[in-house]
From Swiss-Prot:
HAMP domain residues: 307-361
Sequence intervals crossing the membrane: 17-37, 44-64, 85-105, 285-305
Protein location: Cell membrane
InterPro entries: HAMP_dom, HATPase_C_sf, His_kinase_dom, HisK_dim/P_dom, HisK_dim/P_sf, NtrY-like_N, Sig_transdc_His_kin-like_C
Database matches in SUPFAM superfamilies: ATPase domain of HSP90 chaperone/DNA topoisomerase II/histidine kinase, HAMP domain-like, Homodimeric domain of signal transducing histidine kinase
Keywords: ATP-binding, Cell membrane, Kinase, Membrane, Nucleotide-binding, Phosphoprotein, Transferase, Transmembrane, Transmembrane helix, Two-component regulatory system
Documented EC number(s): 2.7.13.3
Membrane-related topology note: Multi-pass membrane protein
MF-aspect GO terms: ATP binding; phosphorelay sensor kinase activity
Modified residues (Phosphohistidine): 381
Function of the protein: Member of the two-component regulatory system RF_0427/RF_0895.
Name of this protein: Putative sensor histidine kinase NtrY-like
Domain Histidine kinase: 378-589
């Protein structure tokens, strides 16, 4: 019964009905949330509750849709491993997101209440009041001082009006006695300064607003706010005609900055306090969108991360299937993966397939060589026997009957043609025999530079139209080898190079010996026609040739001799005309082989 219920519940929760139900619920709750937010009298707790429900529904819906999507993909022969990892990423992202959302909103609400506590508001308000009281007190004192100075100057009108020097002296005395930082008497009619204290700055009526002058005409001191670092009062002198007194005191910059900072902080605090409900709602909405974004980022990251792991494995499986079907040319791209365990696996797979391919190729070549070796022995025996009498008979005919034949030149041409082709056949048979009976090398110490240079000089004498060049980075080099076989290798390579230059007025062959560390290379470069691209990969196979004079066993013999001497034969075409053949001997391996064979 329990298993039945479990099965049915699982079927229900993975069905489309639940997804459809959640989608309808998401629409309903989204509309309800919008309605609650749009009300004039907002209830923050209700709005937060609706937003949290919206978040939970969207997260669950996202997880179910993701699971449904990958379940359908798995039915389409997609990777089950990839689906499991993505679903795990989704769940791991969704559950903590819901928990963190609830606690974040709760703690944010507590923090906001702490920020806008009544005590903090009271302290800020008191600070503003104290700052304003300080300025107000200074203004009141300056106002009283302005009235007192104006009274004194009015009383001395007759003494001062015609004596500017006395006027200035009296004004300075008043300023000093009453601790004024500046005192200026201005004439409105002439727009001139009648008198001023020593530390006063020049000032004109142009800098004083007209409405303040009209206000001062009423007989009361008026504050002039022309400089934030000073408190100034303007008052009209009673006995004088259009004459005004301006007095001022400096306020400490630190006090002004402190007052400005206090007022700014209080204004900003009250502005935030008035907007707190909107801030809380905006924060909640923002957090929900961030939570949803994080969820979808986590799912996307899961898809990308899983694809990065599963895709290389899929390629490896595909390549393995091809190998199983007999394709040993398949390789997995190592440059598409990181240098981690997957990269190591790719490299190992490629090495393994290359080794299998090489072993298969070597096996085929060995089987072919063995078959041709048997054929060569029989064919050589069957052909060589009649060749000798044919050749001898042709030579005797040429000697004996040449004087008696009327068409002597034509007769000689025919016989020479027979002799030449007989020699060609004889050379082919010799190649057959050499390939079939190539003996094991007899290793002795030989001076390689002398050996190669001697062969180059000999070939140079036989080919006047070819420029030979020999270079070596060592003067001499003792080399364990079969000198006869190495001699045969060099002759074969140089003959091939000469044949590729045939038909041209001139050519060039370069032979280089390069000794470096535990390797020594012999490189032959020619300016001939090179190898056809389709044959360059199998030029060393038996009976593959581009020449009409041979059977294609020359390079096959060279390769066998080089490999017997622990070397590698590399054949390539040059970018310009010609070919390059590089023989590279591994001296360490050669020493081990010679040591084991007792050579």
């Amino acid at each position: 019964m329990l298993s039945y219920l479990k099965k049915n519940l699982r079927s229900y929760f993975s069905s489309r009905v639940l997804i459809f139900t959640l989608a309808i619920a998401a629409i309903i709750f989204a509309c309800a949330t919008f309605y609650v937010i749009s009300l004039e009298s907002k209830n923050f707790s209700t709005i937060i509750g609706f937003l949290l429900v919206d978040l939970a529904i969207f997260l669950i819906l996202g997880v179910l849709l993701t699971q449904k999507f990958f379940t359908q993909n798995s039915n389409n022969d997609s990777s089950k491993l990839q689906n499991r990892i993505v679903i795990a990423f989704s769940l791991v992202a969704a559950i903590p997101t819901i928990i963190v959302s609830v606690f974040s909103v709760y703690f944010f609400n507590l923090s906001v209440q702490a920020w806008f506590d009544k005590k903090i508001s009271t302290v800020l308000d008191q600070s503003v009041i104290v700052a304003e009281s300080y300025i107000a007190e200074h203004k009141l004192q300056l106002k009283e001082t302005a009235l007192a100075v104006a009274e004194d100057l009015s009383d001395m009108y007759y003494d001062l009006i015609h004596n500017p020097a006395l006027f200035t002296k009296t004004l300075n005395t008043e300023a000093e006695m009453r601790s004024l930082d500046e005192a200026i008497v201005l004439n409105k009619s002439t727009n001139t300064i009648v008198a001023n204290s020593y530390l006063s700055f020049s000032l004109s009526f142009a800098t004083i607003p007209a409405h303040l002058i009209k206000k001062a005409d009423l007989g009361e001191p008026v504050e002039v706010k022309s400089d934030p670092t000073k408190i100034r009062m303007l008052i009209k002198l009673k006995e004088y005609n259009d004459v005004y007194l301006l007095v001022g005191r400096l306020v400490d910059n630190k006090i002004i900055d402190h007052i400005d900072a206090t007022n700014g902080a209080a204004a900003e605090y009250n502005s935030l306090k008035n907007e707190i409900d909107n801030i809380q709602i905006k924060f909640s909405i923002m957090f929900i969108f961030i939570a949803l974004l994080l969820l979808f980022v986590a799912i996307s990251f899961g898809v990308i991360f899983t694809a990065k792991i599963v895709k290389p494995i899929k390629k490896l499986v595909t390549a393995t299937d091809k190998v199983k079907d007999g394709d040993l040319t398949v390789q997995v791209p190592e440059n598409e993966v990181d240098k981690d365990e997957i990269g190591t696996l790719y490299a190992a797979f490629n090495r393994m397939i290359k080794q299998l391919s090489r072993q298969q190729r070597d096996l085929v070549i060995a089987q072919r060589a063995m078959a041709w070796s048997d054929v060569a022995k029989k064919v050589a025996h069957e052909i060589k026997n009649p060749l000798t009498p044919i050749l001898l008979a042709s030579e005797r005919l040429l000697k004996k009957f040449s004087p008696e034949i009327k068409e002597k030149e034509e007769f000689e041409n025919y016989l020479k043609m027979i002799i030449r082709h007989t020699n060609d056949i004889k050379n082919i048979v010799s190649e057959f025999v050499l390939f079939a009976r190539l003996p094991a090398p007899k290793f002795t110490k030989s001076e390689l530079v002398y050996l190669v240079k001697h062969i180059v000089e000999a070939r140079k004498l036989l080919n006047d139209n070819i420029l030979y060049k020999f270079e070596s980075n060592v003067d001499q080099f003792d080399f364990m080898c079969d000198a006869t076989q190495i001699n045969q290798v060099m002759i074969n390579l140089l003959k091939n190079a000469e044949e590729s230059i045939e038909g041209r007025e001139s050519g060039k062959i370069e032979v280089t010996i390069d000794a470096k560390d535990d390797f020594i290379s012999v490189i032959v470069i020619d300016s001939g026609k090179g190898f056809p691209p389709e044959l360059i990969g199998k030029a060393t196979e038996s009976y593959v040739t581009t020449s009409s004079k041979g059977m294609g066993v020359g390079l096959a013999i060279v390769k066998r001799i080089v490999e017997e001497h622990c070397g590698i034969l590399d054949i390539a075409n040059r970018e310009e005309e010609g070919a390059i053949i590089d023989i590279k001997f591994d001296l360490k391996k050669l020493d081990l082989k010679v040591g084991r064979s007792g050579g």
